[in-house]
Amino acid sequence: MDDKQHTTSSDDERAENATSNQDQQTNSSKRVHLKRWQFISILIGTIIITAVITVVAYIFINQKISGLNKTDQANLNKIENVYKILNSDYYKKQNSDKLSKAAIDGMVKELKDPYSEYLTKEQTKSFNEGVSGDFVGIGAEMQKKNDQIMVTSPMKGSPAERAGIRPKDVITKVNGKSIKGKALDEVVKDVRGKENTEVTLTVQRGSEEKDVKIKREKIHVKSVEYKKKGKVGVITINKFQNDTSGELKDAVLKAHKDGLKKIVLDLRNNPGGLLDEAVKMANIFIDKGKTVVKLEKGKDTEAIQTSNDALKEAKDMDISILVNEGSASASEVFTGALKDYNKAKVYGSKTFGKGVVQTTREFKDGSLLKYTEMKWLTPDGHYIHGKGIKPDVTIDTPKYQSLNVIPNTKTFKVGDDDKNIKTIKIGLSALGYKVDNESTQFDQALENLVKAFQQANKLEVTGEFNKETNNKFTELLVEKANKHDDVLDKLINILK
């Protein structure tokens, strides 16, 4: 085994910084928050696999791999013998890699732990990209809209920008091959490749179609954004990855330079990330020698403390943290620390509640095992697992911004009874249609609303909620969320 790390788990595919209405796939069911500028996928409840805290900098209580007792050794020998027998004596030729993976998957599944999993080499690569914020590609944010892959925006200074790619360019081919009917993640995979290799995109701009050659480079996706909104500085932290603490420090210094005293740290739908970054970020506001998080395993406890003085420019700032049910893991470590030390007031809705930590062990073949090893507590000893952190001031998220994605493989019609039908009703209500109930029943009244929606959006009027209707429905909800951030607006009004 190579490289032991402690983690509490995050699987964030950068996918050329891709966003998608329907086609962004994960390894499990997903819940989508229509937050401001994009779909942000999180995995909720017993199926969560994201929201990673990766404890790279801390070796917990000098953990050592202990020897096996006789029973364990006998069990291990049995597993080895079964593998050998099936690999050599089974009447049909077997793939040894698949047998090995099946055995590992079986052991991990037996844990009945949604945070523990075995990742293949390819999955490990995506996992590591999510932690580092680095990937090889062209640096273009994409989304699927009206069954077309459209460039939302090229990243500043990226190969895509230098090659002349513009917002709203529609990609029709990759390396001469049509992408019609492909899911967004499939297109992203085609666009990505090895560093310093070229990819040719055929893009449609208005009535013109042309080929654009772009050299792939290593791209770093920033995790922190700063905006000035009146007399309030809004710092959005999307995840905790390598150097998020440095990005946060820069944002705080910019706010100070702008003369702002009131700062909002927006952690909504932030699934977590590196624990050492969460500690460094807390250290911007909390003085040296203070406990940020406590790690516990059995009777053993270790307090992780700040190592530097707090940033002097941040000392006089009025800090507000904005969270929701998608704020998890390292987000909760950071929020819990600032809350316990009265360094920030927390607004929004209750956080996810993930208080356990995973360890990752990477193997020589590039695969990785991730398993729960310990739990964590806030400085005051609060264990938030399954409970979350309650805000000091509740600001509810509009229902439509917390809807489950409706599978576009399903069609709903009169007489159907399904939980997705409630989602349809909530969404239509948000789009201005008069919905008389939020039941799971597809009744005549809903059929009439669907017909009205289809007619208004120049779709075939069937009264059935089909794939085309679903795509337009999702697109309009995303646009609405992008234009109106009701929760943030309410908080800024409170701070005035």
From Swiss-Prot:
Task: Name the residues annotated as catalytic in the UniProt entry.
Answer: S329 (charge relay system), D340 (charge relay system), K354 (charge relay system)
Main location class: membrane
GO cellular component assignments: outer membrane-bounded periplasmic space; plasma membrane
Q: Where in the cell is it found?
A: Cell membrane
Pfam families linked to this entry: CtpB_N-like, PDZ_6, Peptidase_S41, PG_binding_1
Instruction: Give residue spans, biased composition: Basic and acidic residues.
Output: 1-16
What does the UniProt keyword field contain? Cell membrane, Hydrolase, Membrane, Protease, Serine protease, Transmembrane, Transmembrane helix
**SUPFAM superfamilies reported in the protein's UniProt record:** ClpP/crotonase, PDZ domain-like, PGBD-like
Q: What is its EC number?
A: 3.4.21.-
Residue ranges annotated as compositionally biased, kind Polar residues, are 17-27
Q: Where is the signal peptide?
A: none
- Give the GO molecular function terms: endopeptidase activity; serine-type peptidase activity
Residues covered by the PDZ domain: 124-206
Membrane disposition: Single-pass membrane protein
InterPro entries, sorted: ClpP/crotonase-like_dom_sf (IPR029045), CtpA/B_N (IPR055210), PDZ (IPR001478), PDZ_6 (IPR041489), PDZ_sf (IPR036034), Peptidase_S41A (IPR004447), Peptidoglycan-bd-like (IPR002477), PGBD-like_sf (IPR036365)
- For this protein, the parts annotated as crossing the membrane are 39-59
Gene Ontology annotations of biological process type: proteolysis; signal transduction
Name the Gene3D superfamilies for this protein.
2-enoyl-CoA Hydratase, Chain A, domain 1, 2.30.42.10, 3.30.750.44, PGBD-like superfamily/PGBD
Q: Looking at the record, which segments are called Disordered?
A: 1-27
PANTHER family (alphabetical):
CARBOXY-TERMINAL PROCESSING PROTEASE CTPA (PTHR32060:SF30), TAIL-SPECIFIC PROTEASE (PTHR32060)
Family membership noted in the UniProt record: Belongs to the peptidase S41A family.
Q: Which NCBIfam families match?
A: prc
What name appears for this protein in its UniProt entry? Probable CtpA-like serine protease
Species, as recorded? Staphylococcus aureus (strain MRSA252)
